[in-house]
Amino acid sequence: MFIADDVYGAIDNVAWYRQCYLRKEFEKCIEYSDKLYAVSEEMCELYEQRFNKPVEVLYKGCDLSTEPKGFLNEPIKIVYAGNLYYGRDDTLAELAKALEKINSTKTVAKLEIYTGATITSEIERKLNIVGSSEIMGSRPYNEIKEIMKNADIVLHVESFEEKQKELVKYSFSTKIIDCLQSGNVVLGIGPSNIASIEYLKKIDGAFVIDDMDNIFDSISKILNEKNYIKRKCKKGLVNFAKENHELTVVREKLKEDLTTMCKGKSNESVAN
């Protein structure tokens, strides 16, 4: 069984007359599962405490067969590809405003936002800033992979609002793996104690801004270190991705786990 979101905790938000039924059904799934996986270490800890069963983290794998590009665009291209839910549009808006200020005398960097989300007039006003930020609409996944590969900095964001933080606290966005697959520097913007942001802090090839008040100073510093961006990407991020997320590694681990479970079941049958 794979736990991608805190479904059990979310039952509290369901109508009261369905809560008992849903909890019992979920508890049955946990009880009958021979192996439990979760999307993040934080989710593993949470469900181990709830159900007193071991839970292992299982991350999405990525294809690292192509070499990262060895140059920076002019201006620096920052790419966000994903949804705008859970207040992520507000975080992107703060980044866009910081870039507008940085670009006041010369265009240093531009943010491109690829999303299939419905664009309201308010979102358009916040995120379409001439010369600094642009909503590019949706694209097929294969095209998104190429766009991210040709970027300089790929972006993952979370909201700083308390309500939104609680909703994504234990979740791990698979978009982070797409960012790693691009071979470019990853920039995470979001509060501490969120699973996805804490994970990015572990990666030597990633930048993290976890204080919205420092976004202008932090992004300015990052953009001023162009040579460092290239070195950081090649040495830190790519090595981390190969060790932890390369598709063959993830598949081999899953294969070993399934083989072990099958052997265990076979031995039980013989014993009976």
Question: Could you tell me what each predicted segment is?
Answer:
Residues 1-16:
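A short, histidine- and acid-enriched strand-loop-helix "catalytic/donor-clamping" loop
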Residues 7, 17-36:
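Membrane-proximal helix-turn-helix segments that form the acceptor-binding/catalytic region
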Residues 42, 60-61:
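Carbohydrate-associated surface elements
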Residues 71-92, 96-99:
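Conserved donor-binding/catalytic core segment of Leloir-type glycosyltransferases
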Residues 87-90, 142-146, 154-177, 186-198:
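Nucleotide-sugar-dependent
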Residues 106, 115, 120-150:
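Nucleotide-activated donor-binding/catalytic signature segment of Leloir-type glycosyltransferases, i.e.
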Residues 210-217, 227-259:
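A charged, aromatic-enriched C-terminal amphipathic alpha-helix characteristic of glycosyltransferases
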